[in-house]
Every structure is written in structure tokens, then in C-alpha cells.
Amino acid sequence: MNTQALLRWLPAALAWAAAGTVCAQGVLVPPAPPAPPQDTLTRAATSVGIKRCLPAISRLSSLTVQGSRSHDVLLDWDRKRPDAGPMFSLIGMQYPNAGVAASITAIPDESGACTVSAERISVAPFTCESVAQQELASYKMTRLLPNYAVYTDAKEPTSSVSLIDSPPGCLIIRRYVEYGWKDPAAVSAAPPPGKR
């Protein structure tokens, strides 16, 4: 075999050898175990025996802590009936330039559904009027007190944003409530009525 032929086949041989090494490593090294849930609330709720509302709690919690540097949770639950009683949580989050708090509540009902609510509480270093103009221009405003206004959007009837003047800034409370929430995965896995 001449030198030119060797040089033509050398890259292919090296690639084949590297691929074999990678495949062999995949066979010899067991796959990593699945990562634990990333948010503290999901881990805490799981550890105390909450199951029925866990998918809703996990969904809300993962959205709530997204982008935070760190977070921790204070959890209250019915210790006699952890999976059948209400769960209340307060989450503290650290962001690069601010601290934020959130509250997530889940209450199971007899039908297997859950009532869930989430509130995210933060402070903006701006006036509430400027926050409303920038973020809530299309929302309907209802003034509850001279320093307290609630904004709603007809497209999201179970959500609201409250702005409370707190000079020199604005206290912002974003709220979401859903009644009769059912896990979409459990609903789609259930057999149709009458076909059991």
C-alpha cells in the first residue's frame, strides 16, 4: 500500500477507532441515574408523602424557581393525611440583583382533582405606574385602594397582577389559581368511561 492510499484511509480508520471506543465506553459504563427533581418544593412534597397534587406542585414550582441562583422552601402540610390534606409553601429565591418570594398551595378534593394557587412576590425599583405602562398596558385595572391596583387579562381569567405603591418602589404580586386541576398525564392514561 502506498503512502497516498494510507493518508486517504487514515482519517476514516481513526474515526472508526474513536467510534468504537465511544461505543465500548457506553457499554462498559452504566447509564447515570435520573437526576432528582431540581426544585426544592417538589423534593420536600415528595418526602412527606404528597402524591395526588404533586404534578401540579412540581409544574408550578419549576416555573417559579426558573432562573434563580438558589432557592429554599418552608412547607406546611396535614401530617395525619399528607396526600389528602392541603399543602402550603413559601419559597424564597435569590436572583443576581433581587430576592423574590413565592407561595404555592395545593388542596386535593374527593374527585382526585386539586385546587392550586401560586403567588410570586417581588419588588421593582420603579413606580407602579411605570410597571403598569411597561408590562400591563392591555390589562384591565381595578383600583382597590389609593396605593393598590389589581390588573387582569380576559385571556387569563384565573390570573391577576397586583401592584402596591411602596416608595421608592413597587410591590408586585402575580397570582394564579386553578380549581379542579387534574394531571393531564393521568387523564389521558385513564380508560374511556364504559370501556373497562
Task: Identify what each model region corresponds to.
Residues 50-57, 116-118, 128, 168-175:
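Short, structured motif recognition centered on aromatic/hydrophobic residues
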Residues 95-149:
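Long, charged/polar, surface-exposed segments that mediate recognition or autoinhibition
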Residues 171-196:
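Short, low-complexity, Pro/Ser/Thr/Gly-rich segments in the mature regions of secreted, periplasmic
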Residues 151-154, 160-169, 174:
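Short, exposed beta-strand-loop hairpins at the edges of beta-sheets
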